[in-house]
Amino acid sequence: MYKCALILAAGKGKRMKSDLPKVLHKVCDKEMVNHVIDTMRKSELQDVNVVIGKGAELVREATSKKNISYSLQSEQLGTGHAVKCAEDFLRGKDGVVAIFTGDAPLITEDTVKNLIDFHEKGGYKATIITALIDNPEGYGRIIRNVDGSVKKIVEHKDCTEDELKVKEINSAMYCFDIKSLLESLDKLNNNNVQGEYYLTDVIGILEEEGAKIGAISVPFEEILGVNSRLQLCQVGKVMQKRINEKHMENGSTLIDPDNTYIGADVEIESDTIIYPGNVLQGKTVIKTGCVLYPNSRIEDSVIGKNVTVQSSVILESKVGEDTTVGPFAYIRPESNIGNKVRIGDFVEIKKSTIGNNTKVSHLTYIGDAEVGEGCNFGCGTVVVNYDGKDKHKTVIGNKSFIGCNTNLVSPVTVEDNTYIAAGSTITNKVPEGSLAIARAKQVVKEGWVDKKGLLK
């Protein structure tokens, strides 16, 4: 049977007080709407359509790699109107459509599959996701028939005294028979205080026609939506707890999960230890046996086996096996650090390759460089890669020794097995096996201080 999803993502979200469309605010390093799209894809649905409106182009851009289609709701006239805007997507399809909102990112793959399975097996024309909560104040109530099918949805303000006692609430997430949904959409009206078309009215229309309507209950946290910054924080905490628990179940140790921030798409292999204050983002991969000491940020990077990182930033780069980074190192995008390398304190690497077994222990800048294996950089070395207009490349051969406070003025090549004396400024090629000294010869003028009368 054909199965598809419709994600309602057209609202601006006034309570967010933001120029960014609400569904593009991030939860655990991913836009809320992309959380929902990814869940739909994992649920093996054939097609996903997103209804966009406010900030439509921004939403398109953020979701452009997701292989989805779009429907435009140019004017926000309610949830029923949003679904009507997707009629072209639904028309001609024979099957079911699951409808979710782009601001409720906690829905799970299991729930989507269970919803559709329950809908099919029960022979329902519509199925509602519900939740049971102790304090249902403000939520629409699910009123069931004796046989367990849904009789109606009653908004809180319209509930009778008995209906107010019901603790089962509507989530605004549904599964519909597509043909029945389209027929009911044609019968919707906006005869209400808000002048809007409500998707909940479709349930009433189907019930009046004698259609069978079901409901499946899920944990309340799954249906949590975001309408404010406070709710964004609340949803983020639930999502982060899920993510961190998943990694711990897979064999990683998180010393303090409440203070460890791991993005939704981060991969961590077993036997890695993560201390508090770490922030792992993007498509980062942490291989087995790593130790991440407190307060590092790693984004879109691959960290090899048995790497130790201390209080450092690594962006869009690769770090090889058995390497140590930090404390207070900065590895900038497009850097490739080899195996058994030492990147020490206050070292900055930018768009450079560092060969295996090389040591860059402290207070060094390496930019736009290709560094060989087994090299040693003395404290205070600077690769001078920028001439005020263009960036230039530096090549340093294997087993080169760069003395303290050396300036390598790019473009320049230092060949294999070379030594550069401390304090040198290198502007020309250094041949293999050479010692380069590029500094003024020391001159000592004895008695000069007395002659100048500088002693007091």
Swiss-Prot record:
Residues 251-456 are annotated as: N-acetyltransferase. Its cofactor is Mg(2+). CDD domains: GT2_GlmU_N_bac, LbH_GlmU_C. Residues 1-229 are annotated as: Pyrophosphorylase. Residues 230-250 are annotated as: Linker. In the N-terminal section; belongs to the N-acetylglucosamine-1-phosphate uridyltransferase family. HAMAP family: GlmU. Catalyzes the last two sequential reactions in the de novo biosynthetic pathway for UDP-N-acetylglucosamine (UDP-GlcNAc). The C-terminal domain catalyzes the transfer of acetyl group from acetyl coenzyme A to glucosamine-1-phosphate (GlcN-1-P) to produce N-acetylglucosamine-1-phosphate (GlcNAc-1-P), which is converted into UDP-GlcNAc by the transfer of uridine 5-monophosphate (from uridine 5-triphosphate), a reaction catalyzed by the N-terminal domain. This is Bifunctional protein GlmU. It comes from Clostridium acetobutylicum (strain ATCC 824 / DSM 792 / JCM 1419 / IAM 19013 / LMG 5710 / NBRC 13948 / NRRL B-527 / VKM B-1787 / 2291 / W).
